[in-house]
């Protein structure tokens, strides 16, 4: 009888070890446990136990378990991309930025969200850079409606207005990554251009989130920069993608954004310098008062 019970237990353990749905959850939990920004809390320990005790009978159930656990380990910015999501993302025709040259030497740059491939990222940045003259009186960077994506093409697009110092830090549980313009250009694969020193107005709304909030923070603390509009979405944290079986990907929040001012941002909205329902008009008024 005892041998039979031991044999049954061994068979159950073998089945658990070979079940792809259970292994899917276990792999994701290991990733979250090691890297999640909130994966050192008692809430995470409870969520981890629940996830590991689950017995998903399908890939969809396993993914739902992982998605729920991810919100505890990484917070609201964490999400799971299925294979279908990945395919849709790869085939999406991403909107490119626009540049409008206004009277008085003002450039109005609109940066939409972007999650395309590296080739499209180069096109994204160069769409702006190729449209800019070498001298400007001022620039308006419109981040309204930009929900984020890959921050490097976005920053590369406006790098001419940033100083040659540490523009942003990404602070994880183990590291503090310091980012400067040179690093951004190398990652984006875009040639660096000469700086343009002029007043910079940034426009935000409640949809300005994630990577577009990172762009906002790149300019934070600069005496020639000012923000106008509404508080942002509150996703100023750094996400890292991790591959999972079946072509899916866990996009896990692993750290916080740190501005040059030393301020730390993560889940809270970023308030504008000027709260207004007419940000473009307010920005133009400020520019007119500050043009050299």
Model-derived regions, located:
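Short acidic catalytic loops
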Residues: 109-110, 131-148, 202-203
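Terminal peptide-recognition signature
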Residues: 28, 69, 109, 141, ...
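A short, well-ordered alpha-helical element
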Residues: 117-137
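Sec-dependent N-terminal signal peptides
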Residues: 4-14
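Gly/Ser/Thr-rich loop/hinge elements
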Residues: 148-201, 237-243, 254-258, 264-265
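STAS-typified acidic loop motif
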Residues: 97-122
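Extended, small/polar residue-biased N-terminal targeting/export presequences
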Residues: 36-104, 291
